[in-house]
Amino acid sequence: AVQLLNLDSTNMEPSHWKLMVHAIWEHYDDFDGFVIAHGTDTLAYTASLLALALSKVEIPVFLVSSQLPLNQEGANGNENFRRSVELICAGIHSGVYVVYRNEDGRCFLHHGGHLVSSGDYSNDFYSRDAVCLGEVSKVMEGECSRAAMHLNQWTEELKRDKICSQRNGNGIDLSRMGELKSDVLCIEPYVGLNYQQIVLNKEIRAVIHGLYHSATACIGGTNEEQKSEYSMLPFLMRCREARIPVIVTPCPNEAAYASGVWMMEAGAVPVYGMTKEMVYVKTLLAGVLGYPNEKLCSFLKEDVCGE
């Protein structure tokens, strides 16, 4: 075991991700798989980052969390850990995964690049193609889980599941990953968002702008409203003049509303099918790779790890 970091995951910084990636590459030949203990708060971000940064690693990497301290009744960390080790021992394909038991007792295997942060007032995690590994009411020392009894059958089924197709992407070699800079600004839409209060300094390399569930943001209805401080359109013009790309997400598919079309015409770059956590960390990694704005946009649409 290697204690690389000992901190609340709330205090995670980009430099900590670099340490994780380098540590795994450093010990790559020593193990058949890795299990990383991680807090729940920033789990989805770390899982997404590692799914990309370790896309060339040929062994499985699991992130394990617990919603409660391990010595408290009802904590799911013990089961999450056990199932992760079982899957590694059974020969699951290489890739980055998260095993997590939700409050309803069902345990799921997640593609690290598809994991979404827990919702408000919830300890559960979801992803679009999660595989249910079954139900276990309680994991005790010395007691085999139902998972272990059907392990070989599980693993063969999982190998055919798209969640284990992370190697189908192009992959990127980040064994010598450089510094991750905090030069990506994230904005979430809300009623009353005043774009004139947003300062675009020279250190901002890209902006990621969230959207409402219908893939829209405020752009105003009338010509006058489209020029107001609440409209995204003047902000897009400012970013274009400063040569700062604005990436909009989540976009399930092509814009269905006129506001979405106007955003694209004003220069917004849509990214389809990825979580906001993945879009953010992928944009960060584009900076490490030294990609200019033009290459950033094409890189976001490139499949690296099945994201």
Can you say where each PLM-predicted feature lies in the sequence?
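ATP/NTP phosphate-donor binding region
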Residues: A1-E26, E254
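Internal, active-site/partner-interface "lid" segment
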Residues: I92-G119, K295-E307
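C-terminal non-catalytic interaction/assembly regions of soluble proteins
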Residues: L211-E307
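Structural motif
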Residues: D32-F34, A206
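Short, acidic/small-residue loops that bind anionic groups at enzyme active sites
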Residues: A47-E79, R83-Y97, R240-P250
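Gly/Ser/Thr-rich loops at beta-strand to alpha-helix junctions
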Residues: I36-A44, D104-G105, Y212-T216, P252-A255
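Accessory alpha-helical/coil subdomains and C-terminal extensions
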Residues: F108-G221, S228
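Short Gly/Thr/Asp-enriched flexible loops that form oxyanion-binding sites at enzyme active sites
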Residues: I36-I59, G220-F235
